[in-house]
A protein has these predicted regions:
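A structural signal for well-ordered alpha-helical segments within the folded catalytic domains
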Residues: 40, 44-48, 72-77, 98-99
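Phosphate-handling substructures
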Residues: 1-48
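Homeobox/homeodomain signature
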Residues: 21-23, 68, 75, 86
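Helix-loop module immediately N-terminal to the HCX5R catalytic loop
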Residues: 47-55
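Acidic, low-complexity terminal tails and accessory targeting/binding regions
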Residues: 1-15, 55-64, 77-135
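Generic beta-sheet signal
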Residues: 62-72
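Short amphipathic alpha-helical molecular recognition features
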Residues: 34, 41, 66-67, 93
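Short, intrinsically disordered low-complexity segments
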Residues: 22, 44, 75, 126-129
Length: 135
């Protein structure tokens, strides 16, 4: 379920660069690659995964720690969904570096998870007239 976004059928490096520019101008979350997926498709998979994880967390025999290994977009969408971030907040999140750990840790005092390894922000990312909240 943590499969990265399908980028469709790219023929040339120049085409890839053009599509990346369009995606950045349009917004990473909603842009759909020709013959591929939008960030919303990956978000839906993450949402399904979280439903399963929440059920697993309720089991007494479930381990205290959970490790997810995936790609940068899926990581950012997981963080977006977990913390109920807006699309604008998601689009300002920079991609983690290759091999970077992104750690969510339970705060025993509050009972809430915290992002203890924050992702860098890009304040120049796409801005919308008002934030869009999905949940």
């Amino acid at each position: 379920r943590l499969r990265e976004q399908e980028w469709g059928y790219l023929r040339t490096y120049a085409e890839l660069q053009q599509l990346k520019k369009e995606r950045r101008d349009y917004g990473i979350f909603y842009y759909r690659f020709p013959g591929g997926e939008a960030g919303t498709d990956v978000y839906d998979r993450i949402n399904d995964l979280l439903g399963s994880l929440h059920r697993d967390f309720l089991r007494e025999d479930y381990p205290q720690n959970c490790v997810l290994i995936t790609h940068s977009l899926a990581i950012r969408l997981f963080v977006m969904r977990w913390f109920h971030l807006t699309v604008e907040e998601f689009e300002q999140m920079c991609s983690p570096k290759n091999g970077q750990l992104v750690i969510l840790q339970l705060n025993d005092a509050t009972g809430d998870y915290e992002l203890v390894t924050p992702l860098e922000k890009d304040e120049t990312a796409v801005r919308r007239s008002r934030p869009i909240r999905l949940h």
